[in-house]
Amino acid sequence: MKAGSIALVTAGLVGGLALALSVSGLLGSGTLAAQDAAELARVAGGETERVVPGNAGQVNLSFAPVARAVQPAVVNIFTARVMRQRQQMGAFFSMFESQPRVENSLGSGVIVDGAGLVITNNHVVQGADQILVALADRREYPAKLVFAEPRLDLALLKIDPQGSALPVARLGDSDRAQVGDLVLAIGNPFGVGQTVTQGIVSATARTGIGVSDAQFFIQTDAAINQGNSGGALAALSGEVIGINSAILTGGRDGGSIGLGFAIPSNMVKIFLRGASTGKFVTAWVGVEGEPLTAESAKAAGLDRPTGMLVTAVSAGSPADQAGLKAGDIVYAIDGKEVLDPGALRYRIASQPVGESVTVTIVRRGSAQNLKMNLTAPPENPPRQLTQIPSGSILAGVSIANLSPALAQELGAGLPERGVVVVNVPREAPAARTRFPRPGDIVESVNGQRVASVADVRTALGAAQGQTLFRLNRNGQRVECLYQAPAQFGCRAVA
């Protein structure tokens, strides 16, 4: 990495992060539709007014009470992983068993339940053979992993306090944080011991960080370094509003440059609900959409391209039952601004299944609020996971019918219907050509539209030496031509 370059690193074994989630209130706009939408959103959201320090005495107030309230519930996490090395020195030396190598790493965590439940990042404990949790008061307990969700980069540990009382952190409402709010990042950077750093919420609803799937992150300038992963980002109320997860670094040292990111506490709450049932499920909307352009925003009466343009609504979905229609612009959820499809996914994912939300929309230049009841995504059609047999460039590749449930499992942004590539084994012929890739949607084979696993198998069976595939790869159309026995090429198409 060149000095001064910016690279994303995960915090924990590699790096740390702290951040407070903050969601800014909707801004007033110049056009009537935008003003109406913003007002409806404000009523639904109920923001709390912030005040700046009014005098020197207030400026000099200490953060010590906040630190004392949160620090006891923030723990250090030490992990060990046994790595066995392959013997490469011939038959004679293979008689001697290779010595295992132990890889140690460290991170942080937050106690969220007096029974001994500790939340941390998945990357802190993934693959660990031994986990040790050390409290701020020097008590130490072995821990076991009881639940993990790699898509969120969250994991839940369990320790046995053996009848002793444990300090417990309070999880706050991360949606109430705002840019400029003061926050504290608490963790174990570089293993030096528990450390508190102070900063502000630098940005809210930050997406595209690349650490976990379908998420918003809270950005903060509080100093975060290696070992902070899984630690707390605390508001001045003494509540935890984020879990440290990642940092952006410059140069080779991997240290903090004031760009840290945390998983919002509201998403942590949904994760904990999933842990209690053994399965992480987020609410389903049943819409497809695209970001607003300046042109479409102007046509809708908005003076800026904020919102998601609805392009399709699934029949019988929560969106359909709420009255959403193609062409509507989703402006806010419960008063919280929706910038794009990713923002909508987060706003819905951070709400419990079974709850209802207020959706602020703009329809034909007029703003209105709709009530939407959230349900779990259905497994319809059945996924019919299938491995393609030999005799095709796709031999060994696993495909499945997409459904709302499978789309949620596989990751953000996938459509809720069609045929998706689930797995490409390393030994499969397709792996050598990097075609297809997991997550690709197969739209047609030799010009024949395919809507199910059965359609794909039929089309492949009819192919004679030359096969043209049309794919949807992360929203980009791609055509790939395979000519037996070994000619292959792909190109992007409009």
Residue ranges, per PLM feature:
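Short, low-complexity, Pro/Ser/Thr/Gly-rich segments in the mature regions of secreted, periplasmic
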Residues: 479-494
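Serine-dependent protease modules
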Residues: 2-358, 362-395, 400-405, 417, ...
